Amino acid sequence: MSAASGRFPGLFPIRYTVLVLCAVGTITGLGAALAWGGWWWLLPLVLGALSAVGVQDLRQTRHAVLRNYPVIGHMRFMLEFIRPEIRQYFIEGDHENLPFSRAQRSLVYQRSKGVSDSRPFGTLLDVSAPGYEWVNHSMVPTKLASQDFRTWIGGTPGQPLPGVDVCTQPYHASVFNISAMSFGALSANAVLALNLGARTGGFAHDTGEGSISKYHREHGGDLIWQIASGYFGCRNPDGTFSDEKFVENARDPQVKMIELKLSQGAKPGHGGMLLGAKVTPEIAAARGIPVGQDCISPPFHSAFSTPLELMHFIGRLRRLSGGKPVGIKLCIGHPWEWFAMVKAMLETDITPDFIVVDGAEGGTGAAPVEFTDHVGVPLQEGLILVHNTLVGVKLRDRIKIGAAAKVI
């Protein structure tokens, strides 16, 4: 063998060794099978199949690895395929890895199954490590009147909030709710399970921008109807907002609040598309779009274009819904754009009943990696900015703030 040339002298490149061995083994095995029969036929069959794979590897032009290393090159793709499982089961620690550590996942599994999640001895965390978080306790704890942690959104019954076009049907919301995930991105069974959980647990289920399907309605769990730039469930044939269709859904007793999505943490400013092949009759009926056609959510709204117009649109939605709470969901980008929205609240005296801050670490069905990894303000920084701004202009008491982005 020549090390300099990387070839067996006068024969073939070393990287073809496995293919050559398979071919030679096929011929040898065939002779053995003809001579002795029985199980010997397995040898030429297996090696012959591998030889055929190797020939196809040499002919294909899609993967350079397979073309240069026929047969054996498939090991690379097999190892890539099982790499996540190898890391999860044998390498990663209990408190590392993203988006959720093994300890966090185990806690969710235990509580979902009703298994005890208590632990003896003490914390396994390094309390001196950077990023360690804790909660300061009180030296004089009090007894809670209830463990059902809830808050009123849109005022309280009989005591509406100050301002113009205010809410007249406040909602007593749980402090934990199901974040927005659309039917279409989720299966029917997933939507059914989430809404049944919402009804059983006494919290709200955000529909996501895909509007309200029959599966959202089947179990009767409270709904937060999310409306995005595609206006699904409340759109005209040309994709613009429809007052009449909005009223049909918004005044459904199961719909407790309306959430106007301005941007999404995982892909702020990007919009989205559901391929026509996925637009089934059920999805089309829920969204009010043609079956089998690409379903596009523009990156911007057509019903408003300025902060002042946004506030008037919020007031319009509140009137059309019969006075239900109307809020906005956004991922903070340029701070001055958020400040402009707050200025519009002060000028119009119209405020959203709630603001959901979506962190840049939030999830989605599909988004470009650049948007997912590097666009938008993370949750903690966004929450601080929104809270401090509203406190500074004395609007914090009128607006409830929610958070979304891998909250566990």
Regions found by a protein language model. Name each.
Residues 2-206, 210-220, 225-237, 241-266, ...:
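Conserved, well-structured core domains of diverse proteins
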Residues 169-177, 264-268, 273-275, 285-298, ...:
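N-terminal small/glycine-rich loop or linker at the start of catalytic domains
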Residues 188, 192, 201, 205, ...:
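Internal alpha/beta core interface subdomains
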Residues 193, 239, 273-275, 341-344, ...:
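Short, glycine/charged-enriched secondary-structure capping and boundary segments
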Residues 225, 229-233, 276-305, 365-381:
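Glycine-rich tight-turn/loop motif centered on a GG-T
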Residues 243-258, 271, 338-351:
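Short amphipathic alpha-helices and their capping/turn segments at secondary-structure boundaries
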Residues 257-263, 281-291, 352-360:
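Non-cysteine beta-strand/loop elements that form the S-adenosyl-L-methionine
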Residues 298-408:
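Glycine-rich phosphate/ribose-binding loops and adjacent secondary-structure elements
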